[in-house]
């Protein structure tokens, strides 16, 4: 019977090994620095990663250098990476193949044992962070005695919590004991949960993650010279952020308490990795290195064996791979060049569109409205946003001037005559949009792409009055436009390949992820959300308390409850969305009279002066409450799960998107569906809903961990 180490080693048969290349560098003050360069032999498209074979080789290399240090042959050891990369962390393709908790624990132990050799080398050790340092890549640096960073390094981070695991090669213990608890909370928890935010080199220096920063022109030479100063005793390294007795006695616990409350309100209790990471950071206050590392071993073993890490990896692959090769997209060489953009409307949404198009495409953008005052206000709003970007250092002054000059406004549609792309941002009413496009078509060329931002109307019907409906496409953004990464690109029956290709290429130029959908009610995101919100409102209107609804939906792990989501999108908008879906599918979607009453009332939740919810508004509860038999939270949860499984199954059967993966990609990018749920379909498989209503799962094999237990389907 093979041991856990044997099984871990077996995973390395096809690993892209990052090798450890050693060369001796004479130090200016005398002596030798052994420089280890990590390099996987691939180009910049494949960052160096740390799989089992890589760790074994690095460990053997460091053992050899320790022996040389003991013999007086080297006076310092440093590790750096190939151009642009230190290391991008663990080889996630290998981690996701781990077959058991024991093997996961062995991987954590191997990481600790290997990287820990930098702490036990017998001479000063350095890591020269010459580029990207993520996860295990940063943990290499944390194990060393000293760290330098290249000011051009792309990113520095511990993103593990974002992926459903924790820093488990020393990061959760070493970092708080190096930079203090507040900085560690930012790097380990806050940044990953803010859509995987990373540190710039200057930020890492300010936090104390690294000791000194050098420019890229002579980074290696400067780092070696600095290391020589440290070894020779000329350079003193200050560590002002290392926690002292007062921080450990008072500040540490207070910061953990604040973080715990923040997690409860922003993340909830479903996602495991943030809470496990918080426990590790809390324990790092009093534990020694060995105890802290052992706790990391157990934490990684638990999380890798569970479902959430595997769901996270599924979602990660969707965003990193599938989103870059959209299903159903025509060849990119069919796309027309977009050299000028017209935006119909001058309100807030139109301004967001114009700002995005001018900033990303760097082409003239014209907004239009029937009222000159609204046009002027819209242009000023856009230009003001551009100037703010310059003030924040996001763009240069020269670029700001160029962008401002590219934005103009008009009340005359004839100014769209030479536009290659026209998008509308007008009221969500069929007749209004039909009239807009009929008027636009009269002045633009036959090849101009017409794009509608409709969220619920039929694109085909919007184009009913067009002479050339083949150049109309749905281009549905999500709010806020600058932040949300998804665009649903809607192919109506008449939309031709050149138009669709132009839409997909334009979305990519806007730095958005585009998913091709058929012209069906709600497309993907709104149809799924309409099902969820409709079931929530139906439950309340038939006797179930709203508190029960929130308990029922909590296991979905969504960033907000159904009622919070309704307030966010707007109660009137929510009522319209439910009405639209009920009209299309009256037997499956609830038309909520209670929601219309709430829209007139204006709110669902009772909030304090800072906008924090205190509970349900009593009048709102009365307005939406109805008679009937109250469901328990478990009963309602099962009803919603089965309803979602049924609706998504119908969407796939009807060809709204190509595959379940596209549904999940839309929900992750457009609705904030948690990575650790993997979107909707892996969750619906895990709880048995897909088998109950469809007789088969969405995924075969299921997206689950090695310790997954099949639910009962009774």
Identify the residue ranges that each predicted region occupies.
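Amphipathic alpha-helical repeat scaffolds
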Residues: 47-51, 130, 453
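Glycine- (often His-adjacent) and acidic-residue-rich active-site loop
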Residues: 45, 80-113, 133, 162-165
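Conserved CoA-thioester-binding segment of acyl-CoA-metabolizing enzymes
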Residues: 2-80, 116
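Gly/Ser-rich catalytic serine loop of serine hydrolases
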Residues: 127-137, 196
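N-terminal glycine-rich phosphate-binding loop for ADP-containing cofactors
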Residues: 6-16, 20-29, 61, 65, ...
